[in-house]
């Protein structure tokens, strides 16, 4: 480093913190309607967004040690910050057409071309609701064929308790040791290589890909080094411009139920969202989707399949699964499990393990190993039931209208006959939280009434700190500290709740758990839903209690 640049990282940190205060506190930035009429303001904020991106991603934290904790700290330095995300939302800057070109370049710099990933025999899954569950089902089915497929990779997002959950082999998160090993192999390769600034002007020396892109690169590196015979990849957001879409030749693609989500990136309509999701389709790789897709979305998916010179087949729920207890609870999971059956069938047939593909018919016969795989699927935080002392916890993360309706319906149907006290624990920090609570309330009422409702933040510990793997920079720290979302939720709940449940606000998940333990001497049913960060944080709190 040149002598004149010795204090550059400190200057960056200082400037970044002061700039953030200006942005978050300036009155103009809190009024979206002013963006429409003030071109200079829009330009200024986009430029500020660029500076934030430059400061955070272009100059990520430089590590001395190479432990797992060091890896997580370094990875967290690649997260997009709240101001950056808000700038994208406000300006409507949905598309970064350089994403895939940059992913190819990042791959080159760590020693791979996209064609190297073809050997992983990939299942590529997109959708709005259920894609993680479908990926888990598919991986579990393939895992029943260990003799022929000794290692199955699984890449999903987000994680609940540990970032290692995103990169699994044979259903288990890779170890802390392997995560750190492969993480720093990728990190160091990026540090020791450069890109042409003429072709990639943002990829200055020392720069790194963002959080999700880095993890995607890490997953490819890990699965290749571990000699995985087949891998299941869940899309991050959308499909067309998702970083996983450098996959050139998947064996098969799947699309779970479509809905409205990530509108600032994918569009405001089902048609736009379907177009983005269909971007993962590839020539020669058959595509499957669940039945009962929104008609407009299905039409677009079919058009995308034709455009990409492949087929799209709707998968009906298999009758053989009607009486099967799936590893992931919820009646709606039968559709995801059926889709997983067809995806796994393609992999196993292509690998010459199944002589014939399973017929895509509700009356088709499903092999016993498939059934076992579906029954043995483990997926924390999705329709999960935990007994803790005198209480029973019903846990299901949900961040869209459709997923909230499904989660709430599952809870309602499961506890309908229970006479226990009912408690709701909820948070959603980065989406329309009040709308989700309204969906929740209308889905459980009038059969279920809550005695107590607790709105918390996603902060893990009452000390104000987060579990290292759960640090998130994409929410307003000011809103968290002032409990703005939680106070708004209380007001909204009091308007819609005829039963007049007692409402509470806590500053951390640990405090919410302690409050619940003291509310009643008698047993209670507790419904935990909303943010997956809340779900993951609660499970981390439980883990610490169990250790004690």
UniProtKB/Swiss-Prot annotation:
It is found in: Mitochondrion inner membrane; Mitochondrion matrix; Cytoplasm. Mg(2+) 2 binds at residue 262. Mg(2+) 1 binds at residues 157, 234. Its cofactor is a monovalent cation. One of its GO terms (molecular function) is tetrahydrofolylpolyglutamate synthase activity. GO terms for biological process: one-carbon metabolic process. Its EC number is 6.3.2.17. It catalyses: (6S)-5,6,7,8-tetrahydrofolyl-(gamma-L-Glu)(n) + L-glutamate + ATP = (6S)-5,6,7,8-tetrahydrofolyl-(gamma-L-Glu)(n+1) + ADP + phosphate + H(+). GO terms for cellular component: cytosol; mitochondrial inner membrane; mitochondrial matrix. Pathway: Cofactor biosynthesis; tetrahydrofolylpolyglutamate biosynthesis. Catalyzes conversion of folates to polyglutamate derivatives allowing concentration of folate compounds in the cell and the intracellular retention of these cofactors, which are important substrates for most of the folate-dependent enzymes that are involved in one-carbon transfer reactions involved in purine, pyrimidine and amino acid synthesis. Required for methionine synthesis and maintenance of intact mitochondrial DNA. Involved in telomere maintenance. Belongs to the folylpolyglutamate synthase family. This is Folylpolyglutamate synthase. It comes from Saccharomyces cerevisiae (strain AWRI796). The lineage of its organism: Eukaryota, Fungi, Dikarya, Ascomycota, Saccharomycotina. The gene is MET7.
